[in-house]
Amino acid sequence: MVRLINKKNIKYVSWGIYKLLKLQEMMTYLRNVDYPDVKQCIYVMWHSNQFVVHGFRDKNKTSILISNSLDGDIVSYVAQKWGFKVKRGSSGRKGAISATKQLHDELMVGENIAIMVDGPRGPYHEVKKGAIILSIETGVPIVPVNWYSEDKSFKEINSWDKMKFPLGRCRIMNIYGKPIYPENKTEEELTAEVKNTLLELEKISPQKYKQAEKEGLWKNR
């Protein structure tokens, strides 16, 4: 079977998807809740919530790790159009080492980074070590992020990561956890704290969403 996306048409496909996302952006009302008051951080999210990055206020000083694949080429194109810096890496050992070094260098010059901690292929909701090691090595805090909506236009697709995204007019909330600092914590302790915080954000999101509705968070569209 011929793959619909290939090296010959990847530029056109990327451009087309970006234009579709721009159209969706006009119908999406994304609001930030509990945005972190930190100068620098490592944003982390589940792979299913990768579009949370669109709500970040500091896109131009944030690097995103994206896989070296054709699908990654599309994501990379869109991310750069949105104003992010992009670092590419693979799930193999050499690719992971190269990607970690690139992100480490960005942190050392005061930039932020964003990592999907159970990507690129899972296991589902299992935090991998990349963000954890970078936080311990640099001292930069980790900020977990979740996104949530109760609108019917907020869809979940049948994929390994249960990806969520808006399709039509949609009110969405980005909810941020408190910064997690690595001092005096082992890899295992920090990993557990990050995972538990991400799961807790998912748990409290419905309550936060209802509270935001009462406070009129989406009145000024």
Residue ranges and their predicted role:
Residues H104-T138:
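Catalytic-site beta-strand/loop segments enriched in glycine and acidic/polar residues
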Residues S67-S69, D118, W147-E150:
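Cofactor-binding loop segments of dinucleotide-utilizing enzymes, especially the Rossmann-like FAD-
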Residues K39-K94, T138, S153-F154:
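Catalytic core of membrane glycerolipid acyltransferases/transacylases, capturing the structured
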Residues W46, A96-T100, V127-K128:
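Amphipathic coiled-coil/heptad-repeat helices and related helical stalk/stem segments
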